[in-house]
């Protein structure tokens, strides 16, 4: 599973489009702000792949420079690092916006051929950089020169400015992207039959949500995770985990129970008909074979001449349905019996 981050950032639709949009925006001469949450998966790999996309888009025209966000004066930092001494000597600090106006108007500075990537900015630092970048593009008046990629946290509160677009990882990547990734990873790397792999993917999706990096670790552990999810989900309460397990089982197990019921009724329809109408202990009467639920069939056919294996299967499926119907969860052993 060494290449699992590559699958996420290159093949999963939402994640790939997130990087493509950023790269296209920057290649078009605009700047970008990317908002990343604490759950943004494989951050270093994301940066590496995005840099690769950018280099292909730039085609050698622009160089990417990593810049520290930790500065009180972004304009002065850019001025000091991307202007030659001769250019600096011509600068006259005439007002608050003098630095940024000077940078936007000069045609002979390294900034014009650069993409400045500002990483790990706090909210306060990001606000200063965003204001500087927006002013820079305003003074450019539509011309294409230097561009900026500002990386900050998910709690960003600003909106797009002219030629400065904000991209949010949480907005661009959906629950379905995470689910599709989990299904793919479980199918490729999980163990067991197709039902067990699907169950693993569903349960991981229901317990880890958008935290796909944690989800991938759970899938990697496979059977150990299915036996004891709480061991891998320290940040989830017992109630949250039980609810996720029940939701997963309801989605996957209930249809299989209904398929079993229909097949069972079809196989034993003459025998069932011979016992009808049948009054249950609840007072409910069964008049047709297809009206009988699993528990009803167990009552109707009790003591009849059924194949032992079929009788055991009926009991297993009846018990499973009763548990799920009463908001209880099945053990992994119970689930595997149904899948079998």
Enumerate the language-model features and the residues they cover.
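Dynamic helix-loop-helix/coil hinge segments at AAA+ ATPase domain boundaries and subdomain interfaces
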Residues: 1-17
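Amphipathic alpha-helical interface elements
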Residues: 13-16, 20-30, 37-40, 56-59, ...
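Terminal accessory regions of large proteins
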Residues: 26, 45-48, 78, 106
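A short hydrophobic beta-strand->loop->alpha-helix junction that borders the nucleotide-binding pocket
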Residues: 36-39, 63-73
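Short alpha-helical interface elements
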Residues: 47, 73-75, 339
């Amino acid at each position: 599973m060494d290449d699992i981050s590559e699958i996420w950032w290159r093949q999963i639709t939402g994640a790939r489009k997130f990087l493509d949009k950023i790269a296209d925006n920057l290649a078009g001469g605009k700047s970008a702000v990317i908002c990343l949450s604490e759950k943004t998966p494989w951050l270093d790999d994301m940066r590496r792949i995005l840099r690769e996309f950018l280099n292909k888009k730039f085609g050698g025209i622009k160089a990417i420079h990593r810049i520290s966000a930790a500065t009180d004066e972004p304009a002065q930092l850019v001025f000091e690092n991307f202007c030659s001494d001769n250019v600096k000597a011509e600068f006259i600090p005439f007002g608050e916006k003098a630095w940024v106006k000077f940078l936007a108007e000069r045609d002979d500075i390294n900034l014009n051929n650069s993409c400045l990537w500002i990483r790990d900015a706090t909210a306060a630092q990001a606000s200063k950089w965003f204001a500087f970048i927006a002013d820079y593009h305003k003074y450019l008046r539509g011309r294409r020169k230097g561009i900026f990629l500002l990386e900050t946290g998910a709690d960003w509160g600003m909106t797009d400015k002219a030629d400065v677009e904000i991209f949010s990882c949480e907005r661009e990547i959906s629950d379905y992207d995470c689910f599709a990734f989990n299904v793919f990873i479980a199918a490729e790397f999980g163990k067991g039959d197709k039902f067990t792999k699907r169950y693993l993917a569903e349960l991981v999706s229901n317990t880890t949500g958008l935290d796909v990096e944690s989800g991938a670790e759970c899938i990697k552990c496979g059977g150990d995770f299915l036996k004891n999810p709480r061991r891998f989900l320290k940040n989830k309460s017992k109630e949250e985990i039980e609810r996720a397990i029940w939701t997963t089982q309801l989605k996957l197990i209930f249809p299989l129970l209904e398929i079993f019921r229909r097949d069972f009724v079809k196989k034993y329809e003459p025998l069932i008909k011979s016992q009808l109408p049948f009054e249950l202990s609840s007072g409910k009467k069964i008049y047709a074979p297809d009206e009988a639920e699993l528990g009803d069939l167990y009552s109707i056919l009790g003591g009849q001449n059924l194949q032992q294996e079929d009788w055991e299967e009926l009991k297993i499926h009846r018990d499973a349905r009763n548990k799920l119907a009463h908001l209880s969860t099945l053990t992994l052993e119970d689930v595997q019996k149904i899948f079998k």
